[in-house]
Amino acid sequence: MILHGAAVSVKTAVAMHRISYILYNYEQEFAPEDFYIVGSNQVLLNYITGVLPELNVYGVSQMTMEQLFVRLLYEDWDKSWKIKPVVKGVTPAVKGTLVWFKELENFCLRYEYRAIPREDVVIEKTGKVLLDRATIARLLKETKNLSRADKISRLTDYLMARLENELSGKYYSYTQPEKQKLKHYYETYFGKREWKGSVAELYEQFLKEEQEKDFPVEVPDGSYDVYDLAAMAYLYKRIKEDTVIREAGHVVIDEAQDFGMMAYASLKYCLSKCTYTIMGDVAQNISDRYGLNDWTELRKLMLPGEFDYFGILQKSYRNT
């Protein structure tokens, strides 16, 4: 749900009552720990969550958008690093846009293209094609938006099924040692799920490629703004993660206009199983090109379903 309303419309109170309603009516599916409340600063967050005890809700996590992306970096966040604010006129505005997210997506596709074999998979002894390049291309296309590890798993499962059919077939016979050797070889043919690289170094590689395309961006030196963190969290989820870590089931975002589409696109990918309550007033976007000036792109990204809702508070609920 996206909720638009002016400052006096008490969007926050509506959202907090929604949390209370969900917890009361769906207690088997949700616990307070399943909710994250995300805002642009700690003062605002303290005010928001101050309402919850009055609704008999305790244990809900609160964090800034920067803190959420740091959380999603897990072990790749170095505690010596620092979070820096987006500075109007200094931070390149493109970093907060959907265009920038698409650049990052394409970078990951190129990285995976180089890392994952795409030629015919052939058994040397018999010349048997286990998996042809067309099938590999089709499987990669079908899994385009999955993580690198999930792509590898899908390809490996398909390949190993073909191998089992070949080893149990009647046209060629294989000794037991040959079977074991082939299985051992092909189970990591497309690579291992585990990726031991550095997300920060991969992000630096991305930025350097973008510099060559004349994007006016700099490589951070241990200090990262919200859009750096959003990009790194996406890289972690897309390239590094090999075991899914359970996060929130529902995320509430206040003052949504303060964040650009790069943050939302990354969040949507990293927390793809989440539902969202997003509140804001695009007329209050004082960041110009760094935040949201309208809801069009965000509605398209976050509200694809038939029952997703975009609402406008037409009057104040402060005194009603």
Predicted feature locations:
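Walker A (P-loop) phosphate-binding loop of P-loop NTPases
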Residues: V8-S9
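Hydrophobic anchor at the beta1->P-loop junction of P-loop NTPases
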Residues: L3-G5
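Motif I (Walker A/P-loop) of helicase-class P-loop NTPases
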Residues: T12-I22
